[in-house]
A protein has these predicted regions:
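A short, active-site helix/loop in glycosyltransferases that binds the activated sugar's phosphate group
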Residues: 465, 476-503, 511-513
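Nucleotide-activated donor-binding/catalytic signature segment of Leloir-type glycosyltransferases, i.e.
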Residues: 573-599
Length: 713
């Protein structure tokens, strides 16, 4: 027989209750009623209703003064539960029940709590859903009831009323109790609260407050996406542009902070842009800049583009930034201001004054600085912007840069950049800025006068916000390290496709490769090498799969990993990848199949024992490690970098035919084919070394830089 337990906090319409009990009986069910309302005055009516059991639950909270204070401060639903929770009869009946019914909205929380101890029971709100459930149980015979509470939620009006009453002025500790981890772990509790934050008629202030408590509870319960959904749902009911943008920002950051790419990211960016447009139209440039700053930060967050094995920019770059440039603020930001006078030609009666600058990353400048530092036609100075606090501060001041542009170059930031940077511009004939990040945006804030501005963009920058706040009309020459990077950036930044675009060049990174060509021992034939594993984009798991396929047929193959490890502190997404990688790696290191060489300043020596050099990355500019390995005489095997595969320019157009493969299976096949004999392996390595030295060695690349800076060979 089906057992129904009805819980009521307020006196029901007794005639309706009696009719319902008769219907339950006709369906073969027993019906028990437990109420916190005063049963004694209506005892005759309850007896006439022929209930199978009636229980008067405590009408007030019993216990310590602290518990009574908590009850007094709690929402009505929780207060009912605190009254009833200690009743043994109620708990016993709840464990036996097939259907648990909340007769009114105040009893919903109590029924939900009881259902946590009887997972097989239906937990419902209202008599009609309960009758349907009992009828379904009868029709199914002995079949187990189906869990669910689609009909259990109170009406929107009831929820709105309760939320207004409960949230207004409620202490934070009480709200946190109502949205605590046990509640939010349940689909029922989570759905109940999501319904509450979207209920109609709730004032914006209360809706925002409630949604944040709900999100906090869901996140604590491990429902990260649920927390994001709750905040986004509340945002959809808020009319204020600033509040809506703030809630959607919080929503997507819940997921980003956990290494996830948010589903609501386009909506969050659009909300910030709408808020920015509104403030910009009203002349509120500081607030417009703040909102635009958040839009750019979210749109180009590293968790979305850098710490993943894919990116929206790798799929449809133009479509991804189209909504961004449809906004008023981005059109204002992207308007080219140009320079008042063209840059002066290189001097003829004295050496060229060349200022080479970067901010903390001079990794690719050593050969340039060494060569031009000794060049008779060049007077060289080097400026590391990160070495001076004042220059560091203005170089990465993203929001201030935006505000200055939106305000028409009329802020104190403009004055500060003029004061700090103008002396360097006045001295230099040519400025060469490495990395198109914050300093490029800062430098193009002011007119460069007649100084020539040259900026180099590697690969990383394409996936950041910085090209979108740089005024390329004030840059004379833009240097890319590879054609596929040039193509991607041009598709992202409208200024690079307009009449004010700078001249573009493709010049390889400066590498001294001749010293890598050293003899290799015969046993290196079976040693694979991967140089650089410190980023998710390097995807060393791909290299592990290549090794697995090779060792399946010949266990002489080994893998050496050269370079520092990824940092789990970079982001949650990086940590997740690192955990997967370490799990795969541990048994291979233990067995000797993989050797971790760690970071080294002498890559050339490490390469003497490596016979095959891998590029397993999902994206690269020009993979220096692969080029160094090829120069050493190792067999090059490069993955067709997925971010660029199939495009007019990619790894296949950067490297000679045959070097690039699509899958680990193709990589393993290429390695087997060229390492089958020592003669074949050495022949392939010699050909690779010859190509590397004639195409990428510094004496070759140096001529391109001399032409760039001096107009000579």
């Amino acid at each position: 027989m089906t057992v129904v337990l009805i819980v009521a906090a307020t006196r029901p319409q007794l005639a309706v209750l009696a009719d319902s009990v008769r219907t339950f009986h006709e369906l073969g069910a027993q019906v028990h009623l437990a109420g916190t309302f005063h049963l004694a005055p209506v005892s005759k009516e309850l007896t006439a209703a022929e209930l199978d059991g009636v229980r008067q639950l405590p009408r007030s909270v019993r216990g310590s003064s602290a518990l009574r204070r908590k009850a007094a401060e709690s929402p009505t639903g929780m207060r009912v539960w605190l009254q009833a929770t200690g009743d043994n009869w109620l708990r016993a009946q709840a464990r036996k029940a097939d259907v648990l019914v909340a007769l009114d909205s105040k009893a919903v929380y109590t029924v939900w709590r009881l259902a946590q101890h009887n997972r097989g029971a239906e937990a419902l709100y209202g008599i009609t859903p309960a009758l349907r459930a009992v009828e379904a149980l009868r029709d199914r015979g002995d079949a187990a009831p189906r869990r669910g509470m689609r009909d259990s939620l109170p009406s929107a009006a009831v929820v709105a009323r309760d939320v207004r009453r409960s949230v207004s002025g409620l202490p934070a500790v009480v709200m946190r109790t109502a949205t605590a981890r046990p509640v939010m772990r349940s689909a029922v509790g989570a759905r109940l609260w999501r319904g509450a934050v979207t209920a109609p008629g709730v004032p914006a202030r209360l809706r925002v407050s409630a949604s944040r408590y709900v999100a906090e509870g869901m996140e604590s319960a491990g429902r990260t996406s649920g927390a994001a959904i709750a905040l986004a749902a509340a945002a959809s009911k808020v009319g204020d542009l600033g509040i809506r943008a703030s809630l959607l920002d919080e929503s997507v950051m819940k997921e980003i902070s956990n290494g996830l790419v948010p589903g609501k990211l386009p909506q969050a960016v659009a909300a910030q842009l709408a808020h920015a447009d509104d403030r910009f139209t009203r002349g509120d440039f500081p607030e417009a800049a703040t909102a635009l700053n958040r839009a750019l930060t979210l749109n180009f967050h590293r968790v979305v583009h850098i710490d993943q094995l894919s990116s929206p920019l790798a799929r449809k770059a133009g479509a991804y930034v189209e909504p961004l440039y449809a906004s008023k603020v981005m059109r204002a930001l992207g308007a080219p201001r140009g320079r008042r006078t063209p840059h002066a030609p290189a001097p003829t009666g004295r050496p060229l004054r060349l200022l080479v600058t970067t901010s903390g990353n001079a990794n690719f400048l050593h050969h340039i600085l060494s060569h031009f530092g000794d060049h008779p036609g060049v007077e060289l100075r080097f400026l590391d912007l990160a070495a001076q606090k004042s220059l560091m501060r203005i170089s990465w001041a993203g929001r201030r840069i935006l505000e200055d542009r939106l305000a028409g170059d009329a802020t104190d930031y403009q004055e500060e950049v003029e004061r700090l940077i103008r002396p360097y511009l006045d001295w230099a004939d040519t400025v060469f800025l490495d990395w198109a990040v914050g300093p490029a945006s800062m430098l193009t804030t002011i007119d460069p006068g007649d100084t020539r501005i040259v900026v180099r963009l590697h690969s990383y920058e394409a996936f950041t916000r910085w090209p979108h706040s740089t005024d390329f009309s004030r840059i004379d020459d833009l240097v890319f390290v590879a054609p596929h990077v040039r193509d991607l950036v041009a598709s992202l930044v409208p200024q690079l496709r307009g009449e004010h675009a700078p001249r573009t060049h493709v010049i390889d990174n400066a590498m001294e490769l001749a010293g890598f060509a050293r003899p290799k021992p015969a046993e290196a034939r079976f040693r694979l090498g991967l140089i650089g594993i410190g980023q998710v984009a390097k995807d060393p798991l791909w290299a592990i799969e290549v090794l697995r396929l090779l060792r399946k047929e010949d266990d002489r193959y080994r893998l050496s990993l050269v370079g520092g490890d990824m940092s789990a502190k970079t982001s949650h997404a990086t940590r997740d990848y690192l955990q997967r990688f370490e799990k795969k790696l541990a048994p291979l290191v233990k067995s000797g199949a993989v050797e971790r060489l760690g970071a080294t300043d002498d890559v050339a020596s490490a390469l003497t024992g490596i016979g095959t050099i891998l590029s397993s990355s999902v994206r690269e500019g020009c993979h220096v490690g692969l080029m160094e390995g090829a120069a050493s005489g190792a067999l090059p095997v490069a993955r067709d970098w997925p971010f660029y595969a199939g495009r007019p320019n990619s790894a296949r157009t950067l490297y000679p035919e045959g070097w690039v493969v699509e899958t680990p299976e193709e990589a393993a096949e290429r390695i087997r084919r060229h390492t089958g004999t020592e003669e074949a392996w050495r022949k392939a390595g010699a050909a690779a070394s010859a190509h590397a030295l004639t195409a990428w060695d510094w004496p070759v690349v140096r001529t391109h830089f001399e032409r760039l800076f001096l107009g000579t060979e």
